[in-house]
Amino acid sequence: MVSVKVLFFGEAFQLVGKREETVEFPAETDYEELRRIILEKYPALSKIEKVMMLAVDQEYANPGDRFELERFTEIAVIPPLSGG
């Protein structure tokens, strides 16, 4: 297990009430496991579960992606993007 920083933006921040927190993840993991762990730890995110995106070290993550997490890894929880 490795402790990594999880960052919350926009509606994710509003739902969780924190900008960032350190969370334990397996050092070798995949996109699906990252989502599962984050949603278990922060059930309020279920409101945006179907539309939220994850980024690992400032790169968008996709289903099927695998990761080797390290102590300085950052995971961002990004709500649906909107604009005009």
From Swiss-Prot:
GO molecular function: molybdopterin synthase activity; nucleotide binding
Pathway of action: Cofactor biosynthesis; molybdopterin biosynthesis
Keywords recorded for this protein, A-Z: Cytoplasm, Molybdenum cofactor biosynthesis, Nucleotide-binding, Phosphoprotein
Pfam families listed in its UniProt record: ThiS
GO CC terms, sorted: cytosol; molybdopterin adenylyltransferase complex; molybdopterin synthase complex
Biological-process GO terms, alphabetical: Mo-molybdopterin cofactor biosynthetic process
Transmembrane segments: none
Modification note: C-terminal thiocarboxylation occurs in 2 steps, it is first acyl-adenylated (-COAMP) via the hesA/moeB/thiF part of MOCS3, then thiocarboxylated (-COSH) via the rhodanese domain of MOCS3.
Subcellular location: Cytoplasm
Principal subcellular localization: cytoplasm
Listed SUPFAM superfamilies: MoaD/ThiS
Protein name: Molybdopterin synthase sulfur carrier subunit
Protein's organism: Caenorhabditis briggsae
